[in-house]
């Protein structure tokens, strides 16, 4: 299961509502991401993948960007997207700690790599936390094996077209919702 958490109270949401489907079918290949550094089944965890779709927004400055990091922005445009998330969670929901760690996949090699998970997995697994990896950048969907890891390191759409061919990412300026 996936939960979207937010505050109640009759206010306008800061982010447009997303639709989540899944878990996805296995497809013709393994999940496209670096595998967990431990066998998840031996520690009572499972890995599932979900598709997330909705409307993403790009933003533009509303005035000058100051050095304090407190910037005001306006919505510049919006467009549909469909991406995926990878979830590693305790198989037994009673072990869930209530903490969800969300990682924006690193795409320096033009594919999804869970760099942070590699360093914090011991604590996540020991404590019963849920880890969610997010495909947040366009290149990890569209890469054709031209990254630093070579021709076999393909973006999602090329890795498994049957499973990932419907993913749509309008570009990195839409990555922040």
Task: For each feature predicted by the language model, list its residue ranges.
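Cap/lid segment of the alpha/beta-hydrolase catalytic domain
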Residues: 105-109, 121-177
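C-terminal motif of bacterial Sec signal peptides marking the signal peptidase cleavage site
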Residues: 3-6
């Amino acid at each position: 299961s996936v939960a979207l958490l937010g505050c109640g109270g009759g206010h306008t949401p800061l982010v447009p509502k997303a639709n989540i489907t899944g878990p996805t079918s296995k497809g013709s290949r393994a999940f496209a991401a670096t595998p967990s550094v431990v066998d998840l089944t031996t520690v009572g965890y499972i890995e599932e993948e979900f598709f997330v779709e909705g409307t993403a927004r790009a933003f533009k400055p509303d005035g000058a960007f100051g050095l304090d990091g407190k910037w005001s922005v306006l919505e510049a445009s919006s467009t549909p997207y469909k991406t995926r998330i990878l979830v590693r969670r305790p198989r037994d929901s009673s072990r869930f700690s209530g903490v969800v760690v969300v990682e924006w996949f690193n795409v320096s090699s033009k594919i999804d790599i869970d760099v942070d998970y590699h360093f914090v997995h011991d604590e996540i697994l020991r404590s019963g936390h849920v880890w969610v990896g997010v495909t947040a950048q366009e290149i990890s969907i569209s890469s054709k094996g031209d990254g630093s890891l070579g021709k076999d390191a393909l973006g999602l759409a090329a890795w498994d077209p049957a499973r990932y061919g419907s993913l749509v990412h309008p570009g990195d300026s839409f990555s922040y919702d």
